[in-house]
C-alpha cells in the first residue's frame, strides 16, 4: 500500500508525513511545526507530543499519553497538566464509567464519574452523573431508533417512525397530570424521503392524541431533491434555485406584500462563490448591491469587493490559516491591516493592527499544552491571567490590576464547580463571595444566593421553561410567574405585586396583543417576514411601518398620519432620513459604517448644515467638523484617546493605565484630575492638586456603598434584595 510522504499545494506549500516500517504514521510536519505519534505493539496510539513542545524538545517533548487494556480499550488518558481521565468498560467494549481528571484518585485508580448502562444490543439506556443521579434514560425499537427518552427532571419525549424508519412524530410531555399532556410535532415526507411538512400542534393532548389545529411549515423540492420552497400558511415564503452542481443561484424571500428580497449568486468552475447580487426594492434610486469574491489556488477567500467599491484582502500561510486581513477604503482614507501569528498547534499568538502612519496595536495570547489561553496581553502591556482546573474549567481569572509577573499569579476572581461542570461559587479578588448557585439535573439554576444572603429560587415547567421566580427570606414572595400555551410560547406574566400581564400570540409566537392589569391593551401586526408592520397603543392610536427588501424600515407613519422616510446605501447604512416635517438628513458612510458626511436641510433644501468626519487608516475618528467648528482627536501608542482639540486648541487630554482606564484628565488650563482604581477595576478615588478628593467604596455586588469627600462629608447607600437603593444618608464630617 502506498502512503503519501509529501503533499504540495498549487501554491508550493508542503506538508510532510513520516511512517514506520509497517506504515504507521509517526509524524506530520509543516512550516509551523511537527506532531509526533507513538504506538504500541497493537497499533494503538500511545502518545501524542504537542507540536509546541516538540519544537522545543523533539521526541522528549510533552503531550498526551494513552493506556489500553488487553481488549484494546483506552482506559487512561494522561494529560500534560498531570490530569488523568479513567475509563472502564464492560465485556462488550462499552464504556460503563468515565472519571474526569478532577475526580480521579491515583491510589484507588478510580473516582466518582459518569456511569453508562446498555441493553443487550449495546445501545445506551441510562446515564448517571458522578453523584449517582440519573440524567437520561433511553428506550429503543427493533431498528435501534430511540422511542422514548427521559431526562433527570422527568421531561419525556416520545418518537414515532414510519415503516421506512423516518421520524413522523414527536410528543414532548409538558404537564404531569392524570392523564399526562403532550406537545406534538408531526413530520410528513415525499417518496424520496424529503421532509415536505412540519406541523406543530396548537393544543396540548393526551398521549397519541390529535390536536384540533396545527401550525404548518411546508417544504418542496426540485427534481434533484434540492429544497426550493419553504413557506407557511400566512404568507412567509423562501424560494431557491440551483445550478447543475447544486449551488444556490437564487434566494428569494417575501418581506411584505409587493416587496421581495432577491439575491443572485454566481460561481466559478470550482463551485466557489464569486459574485453576490442583491436586488433592492423600496429604497429609492439604490436598486442593486453587488459583492465580488476572489480566491487563491487552495480555495481560500483572498479578496472581497464591497458594493461601494471598498476592498478586503486576505492572505494565508502554508496551512491555510489567515495571516493578514487588509481593509481598504481609498475614498475615505481607510487602510487597516490586521496580522496574525500562530504557534505550532495553530493557536493565535499575536494580533497586530497596523496603520499606514506606523500605528501598531499588538495584543498577544499564550497557551498551555492543552491549548487553553493562559495569558492575554493588551496593546498597553496589561496582562489578564487565566488558570484552569484539570477538567479545563476556568478556576481563576486575574485582571491587569491583580496580576503579579514575579509569581505569574495574583488576586483574581475565583470559581468553583460541581461534578457536572456547573459553576457553584464566584469569589472576587478581595475574597468576597459574590454569588452561589445550585442546579437541577437539567443544569438549570434553581437557587441563586448573593453575598448578603438574598436567595432567589427558580422553578421550571416539565419541558424546561421557567415557571416562577421567588425571593426567599423573612417573607417569601413571588417575583414573577409565567404562563405558556401548548407551543410553549409565553402567554402571561404575573409580577411581584400580583399584577397580571396577558399576551396574545400568533402561530409563530409573535406577540399580537398585550393586556395590562388596568385594562389597557396594546396590539401588534407583522409582515410575512416577521417584522412589526403596525402597532396600536392603549388609546387605539396606530403607527405603521413599511420595509424595503433589505428588511430595513423605509417608512414610518405616526398616529396623526405624518410619514418619515428612510433610505439606505448599497451596504445597508442609513443614507437619507426625511422627518414628518420634510426636513432632510443626508449621510455617507465609510467601509466600517461610520459617518463621513452629513447634510441637514429644511423641506426646501435650504438652511443647510454640513458635518464631516475624518478618520485615520485604522478607522478612528481624527477630525470632526460641524457648524464651523473643528474638533481633532489624537491617540496614544496603545489606541486610547489621548487628546481632544478644537480648532487647534487643546480641550482635554487623557492618560490611561495598562487596563485602558483613564488615570488623568487635564483641562485647557492645565488643571489635572486623577483617578485610581481598586483591584477589581472599580474607580476608588478621584483627586486633584488643589486638595479636592472623592473616595468610593463598593459592596461585593459592585454597588456603591459609600462616597467620602475630602471635606469630611460622607454619603452612604443601602440596597434591597433587588438592587434598588433602599436608603441614602449624607452626613457632614
Predicted regions mapped to residue ranges:
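Beta-strand elements of repeat-based all-beta scaffolds
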Residues: 1-378, 382-495, 499-516, 520-537, ...
